[in-house]
């Protein structure tokens, strides 16, 4: 990470969120939904369940005490050995600092530790920066795997080399 890690007073800390982080998780998700125009939104009960999920998780990057970015991993029961990356979001004032890369590193390592074979994700054509990040990380096109009406791109990555 660039400036926010080099000599800055604002320490970056990434945590696997729990129920004590619920307000920050809902705040980041709300901003993401509005920015991207998400139609299928996670319910409050769904977010709470994910925060307690052992086979998935929700990570928040904090800069100082400010929640700056998030990502979630949730099981894909219809695809054995797979989970789905969702809601990668970095607040505008923290973009370009490597937070998305750090969150994806943690998510992918967690998926590998769970013994999963694949991480899937969907996106929209207009999220070009995110799509480029995914492709640089080795995500490759795959068949549609869900019924998300807004998704136009479907990618997956093997978790084991």
Where are these regions (language model features)?
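Conserved GNAT acetyl-CoA-binding A-motif
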Residues: 104, 111-123
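Active-site acidic-Proline motif in GNAT/NAT acetyltransferases
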Residues: 91-93, 97, 125
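Residues forming the Rossmann-fold NAD(P)(H) cofactor-binding site
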Residues: 97, 101, 105
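Conserved active-site alpha-helix within GNAT-family acetyltransferase domains
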Residues: 101, 113, 125-143, 148-151
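Acetyl-CoA-dependent GNAT
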Residues: 2-86, 91-92, 104-106, 110, ...
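Short, basic/aromatic-enriched C-terminal tail that caps enzymatic domains
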Residues: 153-159
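Loop/helix-junction capping segments adjacent to catalytic residues or to phosphate/diphosphate-binding pockets
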Residues: 22, 97, 128
